[in-house]
Amino acid sequence: MNHVVIIGFMGSGKTRVGKQLSKDLGLPFIDLEKIITKRMNLSAREIFERFGEPYYRALETLVLKQLIQDQERKVISLGAGLPLQEQNEKYLRELGTVVYLKGSLATLKKRLEGSRKDPMLDGEDRDDKIKKLLKQRDPVYQKFADIQVTTGEVPFEELIKEIEEKLSAYEKN
């Protein structure tokens, strides 16, 4: 099934963009993290703290495999770390058209300021951690991207229009 798959760093706008694309395209919206947290009845942070990152990543892979079987086309927002897991490469490529929301370091720092949602930002200096993770993840996101757009530089409506135009052109080919 050719779902519209949204990937990107924490704070890149995956959920907001996904919801708007879903509305505009008339497709259901799925947030992979929300599926996991609902099934576990815990926040992502609580799952990380109680069971560890490997357990959370295994849950992501399980849900990803299930989404591939879904015959109804959807807009799907993935967790920021999912594309980094080697075992997910095959599934991610099968899932559909991948849209990478690329945020600048400044944009992401600003959006993540004060956020305690993501346990990946715990520990060392937050700005350094964001910079380090972004440097590690950006090449992986780019590898999977069928479409790439930059967030935080244009008004939201223009960003959505750009994605929809690129999506339409990509899917015609």
Over which residues does each language-model region extend?
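Hydrophobic anchor at the beta1->P-loop junction of P-loop NTPases
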Residues: I6
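P-loop (Walker A) phosphate-binding loop of NTP-binding proteins
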Residues: F9
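Walker A/P-loop
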Residues: T15
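NTP-dependent small-molecule kinase module
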Residues: Q20, D24, K135-N173
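Post-Walker A helix-loop "phosphate-sensing" segment adjacent to the P-loop in P-loop NTPases
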Residues: K23-K34
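ATP-dependent small-molecule kinase phosphotransfer cores
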Residues: K34-Y91, D118-P119
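Short glycine-rich anion-binding loops that position phosphate/pyrophosphate groups of nucleotides
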Residues: A80-L82, S104-A106, V154
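A glycine- and Lys/Arg-enriched "phosphate-lid" helix/loop adjacent to the NTP-binding pocket
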Residues: L95-D138
